[in-house]
Swiss-Prot record:
Pfam families: DUF5372. This is Uncharacterized protein y4bD/y4pK. To Rhizobium NGR234A y4oN. Keywords: Plasmid.
Amino acid sequence: MRIEFEVTHPFHPWRGQRFVLSTRKQNWGEDRVMFYDADGRLRSLLASWTDVAAPDVFIQIAAGRSFVRPDDLATLAALIEQIERSHGG
């Protein structure tokens, strides 16, 4: 059975292109889709960047107005604070 998917990430250069799914699996701790590009090279993308995965609610609501999730921003702020403390700042 041939399964196709579309790249849906709003900033990816392949957005809107369709590919044939080779496999979907966990790689590097991430849910990824594997496929062959037009040159026959095996590629992978985060499944959340495609229509294979359920739509990401944050991306839908942000609609391109936010580049950072609140949780990621809080993690970054904590990391910056830790670096500043370690450097006497």
